[in-house]
C-alpha cells in the first residue's frame, strides 16, 4: 500500500492563461531538486530492473524540469466544468452546441464541442447499454458518488513538452478537481487513445479519475488533431483555434515540413488543397516516445499540484522581484515539493494506443513514479521472445503457435486493408469490385462473389484472427479504420513528409467522386473538435492521387483500369509491401523489393524497431482488459501476446489479463451502428480501475486472470457479470502455454 503523508488543501484560483484568463502571458516555473519532476534522463532509462531502483523517487535527482504553462482556466462546476463542459451527463447525449461563428469558434466553444464529441466517440450513450447508471459522468464508482449531473469543478492547465524547437509540441493537460484530496492525493495519467487529441481520454479514464477526486494528467502522445491546411497555410494552436503557420511559429500544435526535393509551396502548386496531419506527417515517429510522453505528463501533474496556488509550499523567492516588474518577462518560481511520487498514488490508464503508451511508460519508469496500470484493448507491439518456439495460445479446440501470431499491428492492419473490403462485400460496408480485383490479381480464389467473399474471410482468419471478430470487422471497414491506420502508421514509422505522397496517397477535402477541393473555414475550424487525427474525418479524406486523371479522388471511390470500383487496391498493396519487403501479400513470399521501394520499406521497418514493448512491468500491479471480438487490436497479436511475453520472462509478474466476451475496440460504434450483440468494454475498464485503486490503497487482492462470459441479450442487470463473479472462467499460464477457456 502507498504511504500517504497528511497534507493540506487550499482553494483553487485562476492563474495566468491564454484564451481563458486575463493577460495571456506564459509563465515558466522550475522545480528544483526536491523532486516532483525527477530528472527525465534517469526516469526514462529502460534498464531491465524488475522494480523501482530508487527507494524514494522524490529525492532521486538534482536535475530541474521546466514547463511553460500556456493556458489555465478555472471552471465553477455550474456554468462550465472539467468533465462535461457544463452540459452535465444528459447534455452529453445530444449533439455538440454550435459555435456562434462556425468559421471562428472561440477556444471555449471548441472545448465544449470537443468534449461532447469525445463522449460520442468513446462511449455507448444508450441508456439500454448502461449509460447513466453503470457508467457515465454521474454514475457511481466503488469509491465515489458524483454529483447528480456529473459536473466537476476545478482547474485546467495546458503545456507543451518539446525539444525546444517546436517540432514535437506534445500537448499535455492537467485537470485538478476542486475536491482534490491532498490528504489522500492521487494522479491518473490518461494518454489519449488512437490518434485523438489531448481530450481523447476524458470520457473514459478522465471521467473515472475526476469522480474519484484525482488529478488527471493527459497527453496527446505527440499526435492529436494537428491540421496544417497547405492551401491557407493555417495551423492549430494548443487550444484548437487556428492561425497562420508563420505567425504562430513554435506555438503551432503542428507545422508540416517539406523535403530537400520539394518544399511546401511547390507541393501545394502541384497538389492543390492538400492537408498535412500531425499523426502522419510529424516526421517524429511519435509512437517511439509514447512511454516518455506519459512520464512527462505525470511530471507536469506533480509540477502543477505543487504550484503555490494549488497549496504547494513555495521556497524562498527573490525578494527584489514583484508582480509588477515580473509582468513582462518569464518568471521562475522555485517550489518545494509537498506532493511527490513517494506520497501520491499514481495510476496510468487508457485504452487502445493510449493503453499501449501506459504500458510502455511503466516499462521505462525506473524512478517509481507509477504505482499501477489499468488498460483496455492496448494497441501494443510486444518484442520477440528469445525462444523460437515462444508461447502457444490455446482457446478451446484452437491452437495458435508463436509463428502464427507474432505479428506487429502494422503487419495485421495492412493485411486487413487488402482483404476486408472484399470480406465485407456481401454487406453494404464492403466493395464488390475489390473481390473482382483481388481475383484478377490471383490473390483470392472463387468465381462468384459468394465464394470470393468466403475466401477473403478464410485468409483473414488463417492469419491468426478469431472468427468472432468477423462481423464487427464489417463496421470497422465502413468506418475506414484499416485504410486510414495503414496509411497513417506507414507515414509515421517512416518519418515521411506530406510532400512524399507515400504510396500515391495524400489528404484533402473532397465531395463524392470529385477531385480534391478547398476545405471551408468552418470545416477547418471543426477539425480539432470533431476529428480523430485520422482520415476520413471532419471532411478530410484519404486521397488516391492517381484518380480523376491524376487530380485525385477519395480512395474509396477509386476505379481501376477495368472500370471496377475497388477502393484503390494498388495503394493497399503498396502499403502492404512496406510490411513484407516483397511483392507478396504474405511475409517471406513474392519478389524482394529493390531501389526506392526497398528504401521506403527499410525506413518503415527502422521506425517499427523503435516501438517494441519489452514486457518488463517492473513487478508492478497491472490489469489488461480486452474484448474478445476486437477486430483492430486482435487478442492474439496484442493482449494475449503481451501477457505471454510478460509471464514467460518475468517471475515476479503481477499482470492480470481479463478477456471479455462480446466486446470490441470501439464502444461508440455500437451506438453508431445500432449493434446490440456487443457490450460496453468501458464498463469493465471502470471495474478494473476500482479494483486497482482498492488494491493500492487498501491492500486487497487483485482479480485472477479470467474470461468474463457476458450475455448481450439478457437484461441490463444480468448481461454484465462482475469481475471475479462466479460466472468467470480462469485463464491459466503454464509451461509456456496460455490457456484461454471458451467460457
Model-found features: residue ranges?
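Bacterial N-terminal signal peptides that target proteins for export
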Residues: 1-8
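Short hydrophobic alpha-helical membrane-entry/anchor segments
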Residues: 22-26, 36-51
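Hydrophobic helical h-region of N-terminal Sec-dependent signal peptides
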Residues: 9-14
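C-terminal His-loop and adjacent cap/lid subdomain of alpha/beta-hydrolase
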Residues: 31-32, 40, 50-743
Amino acid at each position: 500500500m502507498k504511504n500517504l503523508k497528511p497534507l493540506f488543501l487550499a482553494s483553487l484560483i485562476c492563474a495566468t492563461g491564454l484564451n481563458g484568463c486575463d493577460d495571456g502571458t506564459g509563465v515558466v516555473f522550475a522545480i528544483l531538486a526536491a523532486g516532483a519532476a525527477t530528472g527525465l534522463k534517469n526516469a526514462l532509462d529502460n534498464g531491465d530492473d524488475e522494480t523501482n531502483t530508487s527507494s524514494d523517487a522524490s529525492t532521486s535527482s538534482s536535475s530541474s524540469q521546466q514547463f511553460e504553462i500556456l493556458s489555465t482556466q478555472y471552471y465553477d462546476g455550474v456554468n462550465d466544468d472539467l468533465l462535461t463542459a457544463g452540459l452535465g451527463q444528459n447534455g452529453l447525449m445530444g449533439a455538440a452546441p454550435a459555435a456562434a461563428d462556425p468559421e471562428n469558434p472561440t477556444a471555449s466553444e471548441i472545448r465544449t464541442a470537443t468534449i461532447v464529441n469525445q463522449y460520442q466517440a468513446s462511449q455507448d450513450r444508450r441508456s439500454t447499454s448502461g449509460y447513466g447508471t453503470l457508467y457515465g459522468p454521474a454514475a457511481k464508482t466503488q469509491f465515489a458518488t458524483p454529483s447528480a449531473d456529473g459536473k466537476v469543478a476545478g482547474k485546467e492547465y495546458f503545456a507543451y513538452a518539446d525539444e525546444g524547437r517546436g517540432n514535437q509540441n506534445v500537448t499535455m493537460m492537467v485537470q485538478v478537481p476542486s475536491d482534490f484530496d491532498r490528504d489522500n492525493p492521487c494522479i491518473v495519467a490518461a494518454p489519449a487513445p488512437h490518434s485523438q487529441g489531448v481530450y481523447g481520454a476524458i470520457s473514459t479514464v478522465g471521467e473515472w479519475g475526476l469522480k474519484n477526486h484525482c488529478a488527471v494528467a493527459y497527453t496527446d502522445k505527440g499526435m492529436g488533431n494537428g491540421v496544417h491546411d497547405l492551401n491557407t497555410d493555417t495551423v492549430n494552436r494548443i487550444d484548437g483555434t487556428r492561425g497562420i503557420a508563420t505567425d504562430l511559429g513554435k506555438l503551432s500544435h503542428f507545422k508540416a515540413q517539406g523535403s530537400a526535393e520539394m518544399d511546401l509551396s511547390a507541393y501545394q502548386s502541384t497538389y492543390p488543397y492538400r492537408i498535412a496531419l500531425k499523426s502522419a506527417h510529424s516526421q517524429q515517429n511519435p509512437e517511439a516516445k509514447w512511454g516518455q510522453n506519459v512520464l512527462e505528463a505525470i511530471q507536469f501533474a506533480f509540477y502543477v499540484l505543487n504550484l503555490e496556488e494549488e497549496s504547494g509550499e513555495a521556497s524562498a523567492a527573490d525578494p527584489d522581484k514583484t508582480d509588477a516588474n515580473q509582468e513582462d518577462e518569464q518568471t521562475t518560481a522555485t517550489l518545494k515539493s509537498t506532493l511527490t511520487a513517494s506520497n501520491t498514488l499514481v495510476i496510468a490508464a487508457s485504452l487502445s494506443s493510449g493503453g499501449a503508451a501506459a504500458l510502455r511508460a511503466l516499462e521505462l519508469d525506473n524512478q517509481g513514479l507509477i504505482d499501477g496500470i489499468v488498460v483496455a484493448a492496448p494497441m501494443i507491439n510486444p518484442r520477440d521472445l528469445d525462444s523460437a518456439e515462444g508461447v502457444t495460445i490455446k482457446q478451446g479446440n484452437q491452437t495458435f503457435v508463436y509463428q502464427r501470431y507474432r505479428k506487429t499491428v502494422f503487419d495485421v492492419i495492412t493485411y486487413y486493408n487488402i482483404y476486408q473490403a472484399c470480406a465485407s462485400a456481401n454487406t453494404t460496408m464492403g466493395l464488390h469490385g475489390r473481390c473482382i480485383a483481388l481475383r484478377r490479381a490471383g490473390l483470392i480464389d472463387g468465381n462468384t462473389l459468394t465464394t470470393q467473399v468466403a475466401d477473403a474471410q478464410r485468409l483473414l482468419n488463417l492469419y491468426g484472427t478469431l472468427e468472432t471478430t468477423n462481423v464487427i470487422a464489417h463496421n470497422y471497414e465502413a468506418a475506414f479504420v484499416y485504410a486510414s491506420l495503414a496509411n497513417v502508421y506507414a507515414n509515421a514509422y517512416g518519418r515521411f513528409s506530406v510532400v512524399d505522397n507515400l504510396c500515391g496517397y495524400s489528404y484533402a477535402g473532397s465531395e463524392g467522386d470529385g477531385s480534391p477541393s478547398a476545405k471551408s473555414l468552418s470545416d477547418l475550424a471543426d477539425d480539432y473538435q470533431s476529428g480523430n487525427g485520422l482520415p476520413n474525418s471532419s471532411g478530410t479524406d484519404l486521397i488516391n492521387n492517381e484518380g480523376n486523371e491524376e487530380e485525385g479522388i477519395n480512395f474509396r471511390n477509386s476505379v481501376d483500369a477495368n472500370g471496377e470500383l475497388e477502393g484503390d487496391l494498388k495503394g493497399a498493396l503498396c502499403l502492404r509491401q512496406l510490411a513484407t519487403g516483397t511483392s507478396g501479400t504474405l511475409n517471406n513470399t513474392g519478389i524482394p523489393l529493390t531501389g526506392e521501394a526497398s528504401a521506403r520499406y527499410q525506413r518503415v521497418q527502422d521506425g517499427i524497431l523503435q516501438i517494441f514493448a519489452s514486457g518488463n512491468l517492473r513487478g508492478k500491479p497491472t490489469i489488461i482488459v480486452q474484448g474478445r471480438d476486437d477486430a483492430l487490436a486482435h487478442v492474439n497479436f496484442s493482449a494475449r501476446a503481451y501477457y505471454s511475453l510478460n509471464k514467460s520472462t518475468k517471475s515476479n509478474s503481477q499482470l492480470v489479463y481479463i478477456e471479455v466476451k462480446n466486446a470490441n475496440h470501439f464502444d461508440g460504434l455500437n451506438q453508431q451502428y445500432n449493434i446490440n450483440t456487443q457490450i460496453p468494454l468501458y464498463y469493465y475498464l471502470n471495474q478494473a480501475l476500482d479494483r486497482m485503486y482498492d488494491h493500492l490503497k487498501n491492500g486487497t487482492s487483485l482479480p485472477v486472470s479470467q474470461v468474463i462470459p457476458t450475455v448481450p441479450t439478457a437484461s441490463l442487470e444480468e448481461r454484465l457479470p462482475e469481475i471475479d463473479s462466479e460466472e468467470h472462467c480462469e485463464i491459466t499460464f503454464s509451461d509456456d502455454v496460455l490457456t484461454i477457456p471458451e467460457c
